[in-house]
Amino acid sequence: MTVRIGLILLLAMVSVSSTSLVVRSVATVPALVLAFWRMFTASGMLWSYSVIRPAGKLSPINKKRIIFAGIFLGCHFACFFLGIRNTSIANATLLGCVAPIFTVIISIFQKKKINKMTYVGLIIAIVGGGIVQSGDISLNSANLFGNSIALLSALFLAITFVLAEEIRQETANVVYGRSLFFVASITVLFIAATAGDSILNFKPGDIPWFLFLGLVPSIFGHNLLNYAVKYITPTAVSSVPLGEPIIASLFGLLLFGEAIPFGALLGGPVVLIGVYIIIKHQAVSADD
């Protein structure tokens, strides 16, 4: 991995870490409404950029692939935003960032070569996730619901990156991002309508937050991750947000006075160790 890609991934990690803080800061806006405007705004920005600097078109096969990728990305954001509203920042970010575990599982089903140590890391990460959930033993617990959909959001993100790996090999990142975010916004719009949320349920003062979400965590965050997936594996790319729990939880404590849950405090390092092992040995397998 080059220094340039490393710096891009660092910027992406810092950028995506701002999402959970914004969701908490505009608590009056429904989670699904926030998710929609984040995707729609990001798409609009990239389409506007394309007018200034045309970047090409999608091939017929990639048009089909991007529809699926956009649907899964939309489901990811819908689940992640709802997760933040229904559990702690620490739990939501920890469980929402274990996508590398799912990319490994997908690789197994694709019959790709997997290093044995990757399985060890997978087991460790799963155990860590269990520890994070351990404080929410009641099936009626709001935290259990939030934790579960945050975990589901990680699965959707993993599928998105697996699809992105194929699309990005022959598609410019701006072309991919503008279409991906647009399909994702339509997906969230459908989910919001099904849930009875109106995308117009916000105040004029919330618009700057929508623009922030579209620019910082979306374009400087996820869109840069989409750029990197052309050069490194989906597992490596999906591991970048692992820094988010540390950053977001710290800001959650400082800005909202939210104590880091004991389960997340204890299980968080276990999850990170497990995913680190996955990434390290996934890279070894890729080189082989």
Residue locations for each model-derived region?
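Juxtamembrane C-cap of transmembrane helices in multi-pass membrane transport proteins
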Residues: A12-V29, T41, A78-T87, L95, ...
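Hydrophobic transmembrane alpha-helices of multi-pass small-molecule transport proteins
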Residues: L46, S50, I67, L73, ...
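Specific alpha-helical transmembrane segments that line the substrate/conduction pathway
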Residues: V33-A35, M39-S43, F81-K113, S153, ...
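C-terminal-most transmembrane helix of multi-pass membrane proteins
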Residues: M39, D206, L242-D288
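Helix-helix packing/entry segments at the starts of transmembrane helices
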Residues: G6, W37, A92-V98, A164-S185, ...
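Glycine-/small-residue-enriched transmembrane alpha-helix faces in small-molecule transporters
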Residues: M1-F36, F68-I71, C75, C79, ...
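Specific transmembrane alpha-helical segments of multi-pass solute transporters/efflux pumps
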Residues: V51-N91, G96, I131, G214-I232
